[in-house]
């Protein structure tokens, strides 16, 4: 069983990143602009000469939408727009949170929104926030790879949801094949790491799910152990 991914239209060679959301790549022998939906730094993936896969866009200033990076022996998904669908598949297929049903997408809470609202096997309401992980170092999957005040705020809101009677979960989708354990990236963003630890101590459940990408889909591999301590 696997999660299907829309087949990219083209492959190319990455040249450089122009800003958070735009990169320059050579596709079919022509330098062209590529939309990068992931705001992370992605320095270990998007380096000059990296092979990328992309879909054509119908409108906008960029001609292509980055889908994945192909390294020597692994494909890495770079498409945050797919994260909620992947998580829904994991739940519906019984790989994660068995017995839960998806009740709503992007439910409102406080002044913002989470990714999913679930109904648990005992009727409990469960709010879910999903994060994608593309950084791996020494077998350790790390999030985030760039400071994220928004991510820290999400953790604080999950903790608040627990006090208001919700069950709360944060799910980290890990897209690196060598990852053996998940940790918050204390060195990159201590505020997020501290917020995640506080959320855990407040009763928020933390999951890290390892997925392997192939052409063209994702396989569930395993849930990774969580190490919240500062390295």
UniProtKB/Swiss-Prot annotation:
InterPro entries: SfsA, SfsA_C, SfsA_N. It comes from the Archaea. One of its GO terms (molecular function) is DNA binding. Belongs to the SfsA family. This is Sugar fermentation stimulation protein homolog. The gene is sfsA.
